[in-house]
Each structure stands twice: as C-alpha cells, then as structure tokens.
C-alpha cells in the first residue's frame, strides 16, 4: 500500500498522500515560492508499519508546496421574520490555501 498520513490544520483533519493537492484554511501570509510544513501529524502509515500519536507524533512532519490562494463556495445566511418586514442576508466566502503534498517524514 502507498504511505499516507493524517494531519491536522485549522481544526480540521486531512488524510494525505504524496502528490495530493488539498485546500486548507488560510494559514496567514505565505510567499509564492515557499514550502509549507505541517507539524501536527496524528497518524502515519508507511506501507508496512502504522504509527499513532497521542495526540501527535514527535518529529514527524508533512512537507507541501504552495500552489495558490483560492476562495470556497459562497455560503448565504438569511434571517427572516414573518409579517414584520424583517430580513437580513449575509454571504461569506472562505479563503483557502491550495498546497501539493511533497513528502511525509517520520
């Protein structure tokens, strides 16, 4: 089997393999040529052996390459009260960072 890891970033968990392209919540400012390193590795399977952290695995990291900034789908929140002429519409688009997973280090 192909090695994979479970990482945590932005209070979400992602199962990643080398070569995967994922969108994670914006991590602040990242230069266009920068490498992104995820330190919170919860689980690693290297093809033969599984390693489980409690809560994270010490010295394990996942290296990724920055690709671009993207925006998610628009989410619309609408409040309405009948017969009172009260309605509020609010929209939101979450900003994401698109990264390509390069390698998983244990």
From Swiss-Prot:
<dbReference type="InterPro" id="IPR018258">
    <property type="entry name" value="Ribosomal_bL21_CS"/>
</dbReference>
<comment type="subunit">
    <text>Part of the 50S ribosomal subunit. Contacts protein L20.</text>
</comment>
<dbReference type="GO" id="GO:0003735">
    <property type="term" value="F:structural constituent of ribosome"/>
</dbReference>
<protein>
    <recommendedName>
        <fullName>Large ribosomal subunit protein bL21</fullName>
    </recommendedName>
</protein>
<keyword id="KW-0694">RNA-binding</keyword>
<dbReference type="GO" id="GO:0005737">
    <property type="term" value="C:cytoplasm"/>
</dbReference>
<dbReference type="InterPro" id="IPR001787">
    <property type="entry name" value="Ribosomal_bL21"/>
</dbReference>
<keyword id="KW-0689">Ribosomal protein</keyword>
<dbReference type="Pfam" id="PF00829">
    <property type="entry name" value="Ribosomal_L21p"/>
</dbReference>
<dbReference type="GO" id="GO:0006412">
    <property type="term" value="P:translation"/>
</dbReference>
<dbReference type="InterPro" id="IPR036164">
    <property type="entry name" value="bL21-like_sf"/>
</dbReference>
<dbReference type="GO" id="GO:0005840">
    <property type="term" value="C:ribosome"/>
</dbReference>
<comment type="similarity">
    <text>Belongs to the bacterial ribosomal protein bL21 family.</text>
</comment>
<comment type="function">
    <text>This protein binds to 23S rRNA in the presence of protein L20.</text>
</comment>
<dbReference type="InterPro" id="IPR028909">
    <property type="entry name" value="bL21-like"/>
</dbReference>
<keyword id="KW-0687">Ribonucleoprotein</keyword>
<dbReference type="GO" id="GO:1990904">
    <property type="term" value="C:ribonucleoprotein complex"/>
</dbReference>
<keyword id="KW-0699">rRNA-binding</keyword>
<dbReference type="GO" id="GO:0019843">
    <property type="term" value="F:rRNA binding"/>
</dbReference>
